[in-house]
């Protein structure tokens, strides 16, 4: 569980003003926050989030800021995230806040408007960040995935976005290569993640409703 009183103290109006000022957010900018490990293999591929937010910016003509708050496991992930943002997000401004940044000792919960976590990884189980977001008073958009299904009520706390995968039985080769030692755990996670797709139409609708 979480300490809800703690989130009450770190997500008030004054904190919001301070955090947005430090990051240089304009009053009219809508801040969409992802918090967690910044790892496209072992957490969540950012492609769907970047594509969805960029489409929402184009459709609504509202200035959006996509904020990734967390830590990179290595330089490969950092480069991949930043290069993807440069190539995909032409209308959306993208910011990265590293975990432990002294300018944001409490994260960026107070400064955000929407929390969005599109996890597509089999190692993700319960998922604490959506609960932390709700404790901070944020509407959430998450994938309809594993433990997220149990913590976010679609249309009540926010929206759950469908994920698509090949039909049952088509993952036999992936499982065999992992259990036989031909592939390591990272290879297995990457292969399954690459076989998982987020419904971008549903994501676009959810974003535009909250924006």
For each feature predicted by the language model, list its residue ranges:
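Short alpha-helical segment that forms part of, or immediately flanks, the ligand-binding pocket
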Residues: 47, 106, 129-135, 149-150, ...
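Nucleotide-activated donor-binding/catalytic signature segment of Leloir-type glycosyltransferases, i.e.
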Residues: 68-70, 78-101, 114
């Amino acid at each position: 569980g979480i300490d809800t009183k703690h989130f009450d103290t770190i997500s008030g109006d004054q904190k919001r003003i301070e955090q947005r000022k430090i990051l240089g957010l304009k009053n009219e900018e809508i801040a969409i926050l992802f918090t967690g490990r910044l790892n496209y293999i072992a957490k969540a591929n950012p492609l769907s989030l970047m594509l969805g937010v960029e489409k929402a910016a184009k459709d609504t003509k509202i200035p959006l800021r996509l904020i990734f708050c967390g830590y990179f496991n290595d330089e490969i992930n950092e480069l991949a995230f930043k290069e993807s943002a440069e190539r995909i997000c032409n209308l959306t401004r993208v910011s990265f806040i590293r975990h432990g940044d002294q300018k944001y000792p409490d994260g960026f919960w107070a400064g955000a408007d929407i929390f969005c976590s599109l996890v597509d990884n089999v190692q993700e189980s319960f998922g604490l960040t959506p609960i932390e977001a709700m404790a901070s008073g944020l509407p959430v958009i998450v994938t309809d995935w594993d433990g997220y299904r149990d913590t976010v009520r679609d249309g009540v706390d926010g929206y759950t976005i469908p994920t698509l995968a090949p039909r049952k039985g088509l993952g036999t080769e992936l499982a065999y290569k992992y259990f036989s030692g031909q592939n390591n755990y990272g290879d297995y996670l990457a292969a399954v993640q690459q076989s998982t797709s987020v419904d971008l139409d549903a994501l676009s609708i959810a974003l535009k409703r909250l924006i």
